[in-house]
Regions:
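Catalytic donor-sugar/metal-binding loop of nucleotide-sugar-dependent glycosyltransferases
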Residues: 140, 164, 174-191
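Short, well-formed alpha-helical segments that are part of the catalytic scaffolds
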Residues: 9-23
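Short beta-strand-to-loop acidic/aromatic patch adjacent to the donor-nucleotide binding site
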Residues: 77-86
Length: 223
């Protein structure tokens, strides 16, 4: 299996994430995609990960995930785990997330708050997105926006999501659900302490736009 870790300005947290992943998933192929970080993120990734991809400029989380997925598909990995590089996700829960794939194609880590609470704007975006995605896809999930995910290879081979920032993960989920892939949540703890690269209203607007585009497309197909 492979782990795809999108990273931006993660020099202070990346080492711990990668070392903990090595302990939790010793056989996993670790792929770090550095999204044009100006700090030592790329140097750390090159020394600690199995593969380091460096994007030209800060293109966004979606662009980093897309590059990581393409890299993972070049080998025979049957499962790909995505985890953020900022330390919000506990790598020790990775095996449980993968085990939860039994009978499913995608498992999304549903965030339990521990330590600092989830920022209010992110909480509101997550709640509204989950409700809207349920209306568009018929799939009801507690948390649709978490970046801690386990994904079967067959999903990545079929689903080509759009967007370069956080809307990529929403678009990916909707396209996968429409393609008939089975999705579920699994509870994972999340710590909010470091600053997020989520750009408030701008990224929230991109997510809403993505959901409404899919809803409009579905309505046209029905009519």
């Amino acid at each position: 299996m492979a782990c795809v870790i999108p990273a931006y300005r993660a020099a202070h947290t990346l080492r711990a994430v990668l070392e903990q992943l090595r302990g939790s998933l010793p056989c996993a192929h670790l792929i770090v995609v550095d999204d044009g970080s100006p700090d030592d993120t790329a140097a750390l990734a090159a020394s600690l990960a199995d593969r380091c991809i460096r994007l030209a400029g800060n293109r966004g989380k979606g662009a980093a995930l897309r590059a990581g997925f393409d890299e993972a598909l070049r080998s025979d990995h049957d499962v790909v785990l995505t985890i953020d590089a900022d330390g919000q996700h506990d790598p020790s829960y990775a095996p449980a997330l993968i085990d939860a794939l039994e009978g499913f194609d995608i498992v999304i880590g549903a965030r339990l708050r521990s330590g600092s609470p989830m920022p209010l704007r992110r909480r509101m975006t997550n709640a509204m997105a989950s409700m809207a995605i349920a209306r568009v896809t018929g799939v009801r999930l507690h948390d649709t926006q978490s970046g801690y995910r386990a994904i079967r290879r067959r999903v990545l081979e079929r689903v080509r999501a759009q967007g370069d920032r956080y809307e990529f993960e929403t678009d990916f989920l909707i396209r996968a659900a429409h393609a008939g892939f089975r999705v579920r949540n699994a509870v994972v703890p999340t710590v909010y302490g470091t600053a997020s690269h989520f750009q408030g209203m701008r990224d929230s607007a991109r997510i809403v736009k993505t959901i409404w585009a899919h809803r409009a497309r579905s309505e046209r197909e029905v009519s």
